[in-house]
UniProtKB/Swiss-Prot annotation:
One of its GO terms (cellular component) is transcription factor TFIID complex. Functions as a component of the DNA-binding general transcription factor complex TFIID. Binding of TFIID to a promoter (with or without TATA element) is the initial step in pre-initiation complex (PIC) formation. TFIID plays a key role in the regulation of gene expression by RNA polymerase II through different activities such as transcription activator interaction, core promoter recognition and selectivity, TFIIA and TFIIB interaction, chromatin modification (histone acetylation by TAF1), facilitation of DNA opening and initiation of transcription. CDD domains: TAF8 (cd08049). The keyword Phosphoprotein applies. The gene is TAF8. This is Transcription initiation factor TFIID subunit 8. It comes from Saccharomyces cerevisiae (strain ATCC 204508 / S288c) (Baker's yeast).
């Protein structure tokens, strides 16, 4: 042991102690144990190579020895795992068979190598005896005293565990001294416990009654939940505008291929304690499962690949080689491919025909729908025009009756067209229900003089036409207001309703 002192830049001294010889411990080199085993392995490999007249370098020999050690360690490790899985302390013949099958080895090849090694052993007897002497020297002495010490250690460990965790078995005192004690209770913690069958009839009946009550409660809860769901689903929804048209169009395009979903029993409301409906529901479910199973079985019988695989790989089928199985599968695959290529043009032609028919049906349905809409619109316009004509005739008759009393008021009245249809509505609400019409452009192209001449009543004079204000087109609401001139005097005996002035075709938008 040596000690050194050194001074650092800050002025402090540090002492370094170095141990060269261990005073109380004895150092054992690993070469004393590993080197003889490695040397014996090298000599065995060289012994096998010498019998085959093969020369090898030292580097190649080291690599070959490493490869042999890795392979042997893997085999021994796998054998150890197999014995542990089978809960054995030593490897059995079945474990060795599994190991050989895992490494793709068979007994005849091993026996052939054994005969070759026996021949080499007899030919090179002197070298073999030297190798055996080396292996006997490297083996550690094994005495019976060591076995007794190991057994004593196991007993001591067992006693220590029993002291820490004594077993709770009452039969512990009856065990003789030459037998081992019971293990602690934690060893039985994860062992399975088998069910104890009930043989008493009274307890069996009680359990049956209890289970029936629980099932009845479950059925009642199920009925309540289903009734709640059905009541929530039966709430009326706002009707869609084009739902019926869409359904008709789909039926016309796709024909009978469109299958409507049948309403299940779950959509109906279950009453409380109604076991009959629940039983019907269960029967329907069972039928659906049976139909699904039958469809799958039918598909399996029609599928050629599944049929071939079942006939080839079933245990009842005769044994066949892998090549024959592969050939049959390839042959069936080629047949299916040729059939597919043969039927592909037919399928494409059928697909085009179906698409063409669907397009024609869709065009017909759209045309029929358009004609229906046009007929409905024309009928609605005719009805609205007839009603409007009656209203205008009534207003003209009222104006003719009022001409005798208030001529000046009628001469100075004008029509103001409300261009902002969203802010104000007409007082009479005559034109609020009218929509746009396609005849508006045709009417606007006609001369204004003809329109004015057609709309004038027989009692109106030329002075009345000069007092009318210009009319704004494309309006939806008309606000009829009267503007009196300073020369006109109001008439107290006039009717309370607003007078109807001159209405031209430009004023009315259909």
């Amino acid at each position: 042991m040596t000690s050194k002192t050194s001074e650092s830049g800050t002025g402090t001294q540090s002492t370094i102690v170095q141990l060269r010889n261990l005073p109380d411990l004895t150092e054992i080199s690993h070469l004393e144990i590993d080197a003889p085993v490695v040397e014996i392995l090298k000599k065995t490999v060289l012994f096998q190579l010498n019998s085959l007249n093969i020369c090898i370098s030292n580097f190649a020999l080291d690599e070959l020895v490493n490869l042999v050690t890795v392979q042997m360690d893997g085999m021994f490790r796998n054998l150890h795992n197999l014995t542990l899985l089978q809960r054995r302390s030593q490897a059995s013949q079945a474990d060795l068979k599994l190991l050989l099958r895992e490494f793709n080895l068979d007994a005849p090849s091993l026996y052939q190598q054994f005969q070759a090694s026996e021949f080499i052993k007899s030919k090179h007897s002197t070298e073999y005896e030297k190798l055996m002497s080396w292996s006997s020297l490297a083996a550690l002495p094994h005495n019976e005293e060591d076995e007794e010490d190991e057994l004593n250690n196991i007993e001591e460990q067992q006693n220590e565990i029993n002291v820490l965790l004594p077993p709770s078995n009452p039969l512990e005192k009856q065990i003789p001294s030459w037998l081992p004690n019971f293990p602690p209770d934690h060893t039985y913690k994860f062992t399975p416990e088998f069910n104890h069958p009930i043989t008493d009839l009274k307890t069996i009946k009680k359990e049956i009654v209890k289970e029936s009550q629980e099932s009845e409660k479950a059925l009642l809860n199920l009925n309540k939940s289903l009734s709640h769901i059905s009541s929530a689903s039966n709430t009326p929804q706002p009707p869609g505008l084009d739902d019926e048209d869409a359904i008709e169009q789909q039926l016309e395009i796709w024909g009978n291929a469109l299958e409507e979903r049948k309403p299940t029993i779950t959509e109906k409301s279950f009453n409380e304690n109604n076991i009959e409906q629940y039983a019907k529901y269960r029967v329907e479910l069972a039928r659906e499962r049976v139909t699904k199973f039958e469809v799958n079985q039918l598909k399996r019988t029609k599928n050629p690949f599944l049929k071939i695989s079942e006939t080839l790989y079933l245990p009842e089928s005769p044994h066949q080689s892998h090549k024959t199985i592969q050939k049959t599968i390839e042959l069936q695959f080629r047949k299916s491919m040729t059939l597919f290529m043969h039927n592909l043009p037919k399928v494409q032609k059928l697909k085009k025909e179906k698409i063409r028919m669907a397009k024609e049906e869709r065009a017909k349905s759209l045309k029929r729908r358009q004609e229906e809409l046009i007929s409905q619109r024309t009928k609605r316009e005719q009805d609205e025009g007839h009603d409007l004509e009656l209203l205008l005739n009534n207003e003209h008759a009222r104006d003719a009756a009022d001409d005798t009393t208030t001529p000046n008021a009628l001469n100075n009245s004008t029509i103001v067209i409300n261009t902002n249809a969203e802010d104000e509505d007409d007082d009479i609400n005559l034109f609020g229900i009218l929509g746009s019409s396609e005849d508006e452009n045709e009417m606007s192209s006609m001369p204004a003089e003809n329109l004015v001449a057609e709309s004038e009543p027989p009692t109106m004079t030329a002075q009345d036409t000069t007092n009318t204000t210009p009319v704004a087109h494309n309006t939806t609401n008309i606000d009829a207001t009267t503007s009196h001139s300073p020369h006109s005097t109001p008439n107290e005996n006039a009717p309370t309703s607003p007078p109807a002035d001159i209405a031209t075709d430009h004023d009315i938008t259909m």
